[in-house]
Amino acid sequence: MKMIERNKTAETAALLIHPMLSSAEGIELCVTRFWGDSVHCFLPDLSSHGAAAGETYHSAWEEAKAIHDYLVEQNCTHLQLGFGASLGGVVLFELLKFEDLSFDHVFFEGVSFYERAPLLCFMLNWWAF
């Protein structure tokens, strides 16, 4: 995980985690460039994405831990907004397990937490033959 920060002196802080096959740069182009200088933006590139493309992605928990450790090192444990899309939403969900981090608002976009879907498993097994 590599972190990009924008507007480090702003008092309002937001963490925006990109979806799979995107990057921090994608979030910046679509969102943060329209916010001006009033929000301190933390934009992580998850492993195997963007600036961290050479790193191996292992799990959402490991990415969340790396983001957590970075935020704590920067003394930023309270954020006004946490946003995660797709894979980024799963990582954000893992971040909520850290009791020393707090968010005023969290927003999950296109995140599925459903595991072992019986119909999907049946269909995948059927198509495999």
Where does each model-flagged region fall?
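Conserved HGGG/HGGXW glycine-rich cap/lid loop of the alpha/beta-hydrolase fold
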Residues: 7-51
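A short loop-to-beta-strand scaffold at the N-terminal edge of the catalytic core in hydrolase folds
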Residues: 1-6
